[in-house]
């Protein structure tokens, strides 16, 4: 039956943490797409994925035109969008990061040389607020693509695993993640021998990690992270099996798609004979710009020699040149343990670190690793300046914001500047996740923090350079980090020699090594543990021993980089005089209304009088920010006077202000929110003892008067008497004469 609905199910057993059920469905929704599938998590979260393919290939392209889009629908969480037009607009950061999580394992799974446009659209249609939809979307996208009749070597299973109370838990909820030491998304596919090939990892420690480790939890060291990858494999296997079951029932037969190979063997053979010695020599030049200039010259020489024979095949010559370059680079690494720039496999390029790189800003640092140069700049402000989020996530605000900019001049090119691309958003998010575990709490440091990483020069891992620059910049701004964090990019090259696969891990990879290697992974962390990890591989599985050794190699490099950074700055500096001063005061919750006042009158008055900026939290915590500390202290004193008053005592004297007059006396404000009555009989003393008919003849509103507390009744009402200097002299005699 053409529109028959098919189902498959994957049950994830988390032991003491219960089970999660991922159910796949096809045939009911989006039937005109080449392939469509719905993935449900516990029948409470629903993601629809539709995969479409263009009828004709884009043969003029030299890359595979795959597009992945994630559409967050606010109705999924029972919300109306907060924008002016009340409809969804540009994708959120969560949606963009999920696009990248889907793209990274999907792209290498299509047949090499495919040039038909492929689009995968994942729509979040229902969401339990305690669920995370990103891994559900990975599985839905894989399932819909598997059904579409495309040359695709799936299925791909995606799982989030979190280390909670010593156990790796799959598909954890937001609530469970509150107790997680480490959290990672792992995607992979099942090989013919039954093993799981890990294709992609995105992992991070949490903002609770340090506290949990101090409480006795296991720290996320390299060994623990490697164990987590192994723990994810059985879950991936279950998910792939369910997708394969669905595909067996409903997948279209694989269609005929033209494959455009980058080049034919005859071009590569001719090119090798023409320029291999010159190319080999060019690849030994250490400097990036000099090397690229020589490579361009050799490429021009190759075209000059080959074009007469291969007329009209310029693209093939260019692609073959790249393939030969890749082959020579890899061969040298495997055989000689030497790299493009002459380094050994574990060598790090020259490092440089400095703080206070630019004037006036709240904190800044410059970090250089070879030709990679990153400027980190920190800005501090009131907590009300933290980012407000209108997304499907239950997280509605973000105090630490990390933005990453990659201008075209960083690689010596021209190009568009302006709004960030997906890559920039992804790199910024990776650097942000690396830093979050070591940030002080809101209570310890009540500031909104914006960190900007400017990639001023790029030749290998600007994202990990951003982590290093950010650590130093934050310390320079006076942020009391729990530990410094550094990051390093690693690569892996493998080659089969005499039937045995040899692996070589490379520390601190160049941009070219990233492109020519089999795996690249970025590791950030403190001296004690890993805070963030990103891994992508083109291999069908990496032996656990190789991965463990590569992670240890990365740790050695990270410790060396931390030593260099700590020479530049090892403790938080004094805060910049240009940064706002923020202090906190805690008041009883039932006093919040008094501090705000009717229609905000009191809080507005305090802000106007002191020049401070005041933010009140629901729990009674008040954050007071001002350009100068004295302004913040003045606001704190006023607030304490209202909400945390020191009860006046009999006999205390105050210079008060008349705030109201009546027929029987004047009310005098002694402290904010604390008034007393100066009775008309006492006001006579201020009038020389004469009878007072009208209080305002002696004291008007706003008048200052020195008073003493004469009595406090059972209800806390204050009775005042005036303090008159030298009142025992002539005034008393004059009073007697009048009588």
From Swiss-Prot:
Residue intervals of the KH domain: 580-639
A molecular function GO annotation: magnesium ion binding
Cofactor(s) in the UniProt record: Mg(2+)
Residues in S1 motif domain copies: 651-723
Example GO BP: RNA processing
Record: residues binding Mg(2+): 514, 520
Keywords attached to this entry: Cytoplasm, Magnesium, Metal-binding, Nucleotidyltransferase, RNA-binding, Transferase
UniProt main location, coarse: cytoplasm
E.C. no: 2.7.7.8
Top enzyme category: transferase
Catalytic activity entry: RNA(n+1) + phosphate = RNA(n) + a ribonucleoside 5'-diphosphate
CDD domains named in the record: KH-I_PNPase, RNase_PH_PNPase_2, S1_PNPase
Pfam families attached to this UniProt entry: KH_1, PNPase, RNase_PH, S1
Domain of life (superkingdom): Bacteria
A single Gene Ontology CC term: cytosol
Compartments, as annotated in UniProt: Cytoplasm
Known function: Involved in mRNA degradation. Catalyzes the phosphorolysis of single-stranded polyribonucleotides processively in the 3'- to 5'-direction.
HAMAP family: PNPase
NCBIfam families referenced in this protein's UniProt entry, alphabetically: polynuc_phos, pppGpp_PNP, PRK11824.1
UniProt family annotation: Belongs to the polyribonucleotide nucleotidyltransferase family.
Protein's recorded name: Polyribonucleotide nucleotidyltransferase
Organism: Streptomyces coelicolor (strain ATCC BAA-471 / A3(2) / M145)
């Amino acid at each position: 039956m053409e529109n028959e609905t098919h189902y498959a199910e994957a049950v994830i057993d988390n032991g003491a943490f219960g089970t999660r059920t991922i159910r796949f469905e096809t045939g009911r929704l989006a039937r005109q797409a080449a392939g469509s599938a719905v993935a449900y998590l516990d029948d409470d979260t629903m993601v629809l994925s539709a995969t479409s393919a263009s009828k004709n290939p884009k043969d003029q392209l030299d890359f595979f035109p795959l597009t992945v889009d994630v559409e967050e629908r606010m109705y999924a969480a029972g919300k109306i969008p907060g924008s002016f037009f009340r409809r969804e607009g540009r994708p959120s950061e969560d949606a963009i990061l999920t696009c990248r999580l889907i793209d990274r394992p999907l792209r290498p799974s299509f047949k090499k040389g495919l040039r038909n446009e492929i689009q995968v659209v994942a729509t979040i249609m229902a969401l339990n607020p305690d669920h995370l939809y990103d891994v559900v979307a990975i599985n839905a996208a894989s399932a819909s693509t598997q059904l579409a009749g495309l040359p695709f070597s799936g299925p791909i299973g995606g799982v989030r695993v979190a280390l909670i109370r010593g156990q790796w838990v799959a598909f954890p909820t937001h609530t469970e993640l509150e107790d997680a030491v480490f959290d990672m998304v792992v995607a992979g596919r099942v090989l013919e021998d039954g093993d799981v090939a890990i294709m992609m990892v995105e992992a991070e420690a949490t903002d609770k990690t340090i506290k949990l480790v101090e409480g006795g939890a296991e720290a996320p060291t390299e060994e623990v992270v490697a164990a987590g990858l192994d723990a994810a494999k059985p879950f991936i296997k279950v998910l792939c099996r369910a997708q394969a079951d669905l595909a067996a029932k409903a997948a279209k037969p694989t269609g005929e798609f033209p494959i455009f190979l980058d080049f034919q063997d005859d071009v590569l053979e001719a090119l090798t004979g023409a320029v291999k010695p010159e190319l080999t020599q060019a690849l030994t030049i250490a400097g990036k710009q000099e090397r690229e200039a020589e490579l361009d010259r050799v490429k021009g020489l190759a075209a000059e020699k080959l074009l007469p024979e291969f007329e009209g095949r310029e693209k093939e010559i260019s692609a073959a040149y790249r393939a030969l370059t890749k082959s020579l680079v890899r061969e040298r690494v495997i055989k000689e343990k030497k790299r493009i720039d002459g380094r050994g496999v574990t060598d790090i390029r020259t490092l440089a670190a400095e703080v206070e790189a630019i004037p006036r800003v709240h904190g800044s640092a410059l970090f250089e690793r070879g030709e990679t140069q990153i400027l980190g700049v920190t800005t501090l402000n009131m907590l009300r300046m933290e980012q407000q989020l209108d997304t499907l996530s239950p997280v509605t605000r973000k105090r630490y914001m990390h933005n990453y900019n990659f201008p075209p001049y960083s690689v010596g090119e021209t190009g568009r500047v302006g709004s960030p691309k997906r890559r920039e958003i992804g790199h910024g998010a990776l650097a942000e996740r690396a830093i979050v575990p070591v940030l002080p709490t809101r209570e310890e440091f009540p500031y909104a923090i914006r960190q900007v990483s400017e990639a001023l020069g790029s030749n290998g891992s600007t994202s990990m350079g951003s982590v290093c620059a950010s650590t130093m910049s934050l310390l320079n701004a006076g942020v009391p980090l729990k530990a410094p964090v550094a990051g390093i990019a690693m690569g892996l090259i493998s080659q089969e020699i005499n039937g045995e696969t040899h692996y070589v891990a490379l520390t601190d990879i160049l941009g070219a090594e990233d492109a020519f290697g089999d795996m690249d992974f970025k590791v950030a962390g403190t001296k004690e543990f890993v805070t963030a990890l990103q891994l992508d591989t083109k291999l069908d599985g990496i032996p656990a021993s190789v991965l463990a050794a590569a992670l240890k190699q990365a740790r050695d490099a990270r410790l060396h980089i931390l030593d260099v950074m700590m020479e530049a700055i090892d403790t938080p500096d004094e805060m910049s005089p240009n940064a706002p001063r923020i202090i906190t005061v805690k008041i009883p919750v039932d006093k919040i209304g008094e501090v705000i006042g009717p229609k905000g009158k009191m809080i507005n008055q305090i802000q106007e009088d002191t020049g401070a900026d005041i933010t009140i939290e629901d729990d009674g915590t008040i954050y007071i920010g001002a350009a100068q500390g004295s302004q913040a202290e003045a606001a704190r004193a006023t607030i304490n006077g209202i909400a945390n008053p020191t009860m006046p005592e009999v006999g205390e004297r105050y210079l008060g202000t008349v705030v109201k007059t009546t027929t029987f006396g004047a009310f005098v404000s002694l402290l904010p929110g604390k008034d007393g009555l100066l009775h008309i009989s006492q006001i006579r003393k201020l009038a020389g003892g004469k009878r007072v008919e009208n209080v305002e003849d002696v004291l008007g509103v706003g008048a200052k008067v020195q008073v003493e507390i004469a009595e406090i009744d059972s209800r806390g009402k204050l009775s005042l008497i005036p303090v008159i200097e030298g009142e025992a002299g002539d005034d008393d005699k004059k009073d007697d004469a009048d009588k």
